[in-house]
Structure formats: C-alpha cells, structure tokens
C-alpha cells in the first residue's frame, strides 16, 4: 500500500495511458520514496529498468565509465538482450537498449525506468549527448514509449533536463517533484504499520525525521518514540 502520493500516481497512470511518447523526470531529496513510487505506480508494466552505480569509491573517470557501462550491459542481459558484446560507449549502449526494446515490442506501452540517472553521467563519458540522441533520435518517434528517469541529484535533473539549454530543451513531457510526507500522511503511515503513536509523538517524529518514509520504516512496534529515535540516530547501524 502506498501512503499518500495520490496526485503523483494519477499523473503517472495518465501518462502511461496516453497515445504519445512520454518523457518523465521525477526528483526529490534522498530517501523520499521516488523509486518506491515508480515501482508501485507502474507495477508489472516496466519493460526495462536500470539503476546507475553510486560514484562513491570509484577512483578515476575511466573506471567510473567502465563500471557504469558494465552495469548497464548486465541489466540489458538480465532483461533479454542476446548476441551483443559489452558496449564501449554510451552511444553503443543505448543502441543495444533500442535493439532490446524493438525485439520485445508487441505494440503495447513500453516503460523504460532509469533510476539515479545523474550517477551515470560521469566526467568525459559522453553520456549526456548519447542520452539526448536516444530520446531525440529514437524514443520521440515511437508513440508507445514512456521514459521515466529519477535521481536524488536535483540540481542535475533541473539543469540537464528540466531547464536544459541543449539537446533536451523542452523535451520533458512531465516532471514530478516528490515531497516528504505531510504530518497527516505520517499519521496514516504509522496507523497502517500498526505502530501505536500519540499525536505528540507523531509530531515529534515529523520534526526529527522530516516526513521521510525511509527513516519511518525503521520504527519498531512496542518501542517508544524516544527508543526508536535513539536506535535510528545512534544505534550500532545509524540510518542518518
């Protein structure tokens, strides 16, 4: 069950059922539930999905590009691609994605979900021009394509997609900024999770954790707010 997000779910469903190619960007702070929203709203309707690899601990630009391309290639293989070697560039990688989608095209809507897209744009990788070419040269000419991208690097999404002055200028057909839960939605979340919380404790949780579902997911039944907060913030494996 998804708490709240009614407008966002309705928007995604409308876009899914449109009769034109759709290019959707979803952004918001980390742990706000972007990936969960997309996977629930488009459950069993995603044709291809991939998540960019975190740049943490990747020591140089060449290794970052190689890691991203390898991860993308393995996602293609896992989702049906056959007969192609690992790509050496992003242009080649998106060409392989086109081949996979064409092979699986039965006339129904094809949803492409790329999570943490900004991580894939490593320095001197040529990612953005290749991604632009993928949308402008292939996706935009197919009425059954729905490309959904998201990322926590809001500044990247805004500058390269929403406010792009380059090849993706004006290409987004929809953008969704996902906000934290409201106080009311926090209350609904705890009720659904069968966690007993007083109104005061719900307010405290909202002030401390900001309505971020990820942190609320670590609340345990039978513990007071103070005990839960202590475990989440200062336990052996703190979540903040």
Language-model features and meaning:
Residues 1-240:
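Phosphate-binding site recognition
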């Amino acid at each position: 069950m998804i708490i709240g997000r009614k407008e966002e779910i309705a928007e995604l469903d409308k876009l899914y059922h449109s009769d034109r190619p759709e290019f959707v960007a979803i952004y918001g702070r980390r742990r706000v539930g972007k990936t969960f929203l997309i996977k629930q709203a488009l459950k069993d309707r995603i044709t291809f999905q991939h998540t960019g690899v975190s740049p943490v601990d990747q020591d140089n630009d060449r290794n970052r590009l190689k890691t991203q391309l390898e991860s993308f290639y393995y996602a293609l293989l896992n989702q049906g691609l056959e007969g192609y070697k690992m790509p050496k560039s992003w242009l080649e990688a998106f060409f392989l994605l086109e081949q996979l989608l064409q092979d699986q095209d039965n006339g129904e809507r094809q949803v492409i979900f790329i999570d943490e897209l900004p991580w894939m744009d490593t320095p001197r990788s040529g990612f953005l021009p290749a991604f632009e070419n993928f949308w402008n040269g292939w996706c935009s000419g197919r009425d059954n394509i729905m490309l959904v991208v998201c990322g926590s690097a809001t500044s990247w999404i805004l500058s390269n997609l929403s406010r792009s002055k380059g090849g993706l200028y004006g290409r987004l057909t929809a953008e969704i900024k996902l906000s934290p839960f409201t106080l009311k939605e926090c209350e609904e979340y705890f009720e659904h999770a069968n966690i007993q919380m007083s109104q005061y404790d719900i307010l405290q949780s909202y002030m401390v954790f900001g309505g971020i579902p990820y942190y609320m997911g670590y609340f345990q039944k039978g513990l007071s707010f103070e005990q839960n907060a202590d475990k989440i913030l200062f336990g052996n494996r703190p979540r903040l």
